[in-house]
Each structure stands twice: as structure tokens, then as C-alpha cells.
Swiss-Prot record:
GO molecular function: rRNA binding; structural constituent of ribosome
Pfam families listed in its UniProt record: Ribosomal_L9_C, Ribosomal_L9_N
Gene3D superfamilies in UniProt: Ribosomal protein L9, C-terminal domain, Ribosomal protein L9, N-terminal domain
Protein name per the record: Large ribosomal subunit protein bL9
């Protein structure tokens, strides 16, 4: 199925690209989220008419994400207290939701879907570098200190 992308999508293309994707991906993800429209003749003409407006919107989103990234990078360290055993092993784990709430409490709004934990949830106390993906092109890192709660 051919679609016109209305946003930059990793491993697929950028704004205005006409790409072939599987029909389920287009119908269930790209089109409902407003990231693409079907590549019909009418939609191609509509896209060309709105191209400048869409490019301005994408540039605005990128600038907002870069501003948020500067705020996240400006944070010294985020401290998260959790119950832990004697050897520093946590009772339970710290996931993306907990980290996002801690960063938000520190003063920068971050959604849990933006927090990247490639090794999975944190299960030990210590210092960790956490990556936050604020936009498809904008990443920020933050130092997270996990300490044992009293």
C-alpha cells in the first residue's frame, strides 16, 4: 500500500515521501495517528497545497524537542529512592514510568514512552545514564541515582 508520510518516521522516510508499507501497518498505525495518508490523487494534491504548513509544524516540533532536551541535559542528577536489600538489589524494579515521574518531578515534563531502557528495568542501586528520546532526531541523557530508601 502506498502512503504519503506527514511526519519523519525512522527507517521509513521523511515528510512528503511516498513509500510502500504493509497495509496493516498503514491502516492500524500510520493513518490513525496522523503520520500518513493514502497516496490517492486527491491526497497528493491536498498534500502539495499544505506542504509549507506541514513543514513549519515539523520544524516547530523539532525546536520544542530541542528546547526540552536542553532542559533535561541541564538537570544535574535525578535521585530515585526505592526499597533495597543489603547487597543493593532492589525489591521490585524501576521502569520507564518511575523514571519519567522522577524527571517530571525534577522540573521537566517527560512521558514514559520517551524514556529508553535498552537493558530493561533497573534492578540494582547505583548510578545509571538514561537516554530520553524526545523526538525522532533529538536525544538527551540524564544521570539517575538509585538509592536505597530508609
Amino acid at each position: 500500500m502506498q502512503v504519503i508520510l506527514l511526519d519523519k518516521i525512522g527507517n521509513l522516510g521523511g515528510l512528503g515521501d511516498t513509500v510502500n508499507v504493509k497495509s496493516g501497518y498503514a491502516r492500524n498505525f500510520l493513518i490513525p495517528q496522523g503520520k500518513a495518508v493514502m497516496a490517492t490523487k486527491g491526497n497528493v494534491e491536498m498534500f502539495e497545497a499544505r506542504r509549507a504548513e506541514l513543514e513549519a509544524k515539523v520544524a516547530e516540533q523539532l525546536a520544542a524537542a530541542e528546547a526540552r532536551a536542553e532542559k533535561v541535559n541541564a538537570l544535574e542528577a535525578v535521585v530515585l529512592a526505592s526499597k533495597a536489600g543489603d547487597e543493593g538489589k532492589l525489591f521490585g524494579s524501576i521502569g520507564t514510568r518511575d523514571i519519567a515521574e522522577a524527571i517530571t518531578a525534577a522540573g521537566v515534563e517527560v512521558a514514559k514512552s520517551e524514556v529508553r531502557l535498552p537493558e530493561g528495568a533497573l534492578r540494582n542501586t547505583g548510578e545509571f545514564e538514561i537516554s530520553v528520546q524526545l523526538h525522532s532526531e533529538v536525544f538527551a541523557t540524564i544521570n539517575l541515582q538509585v538509592v536505597a530508601a530508609e
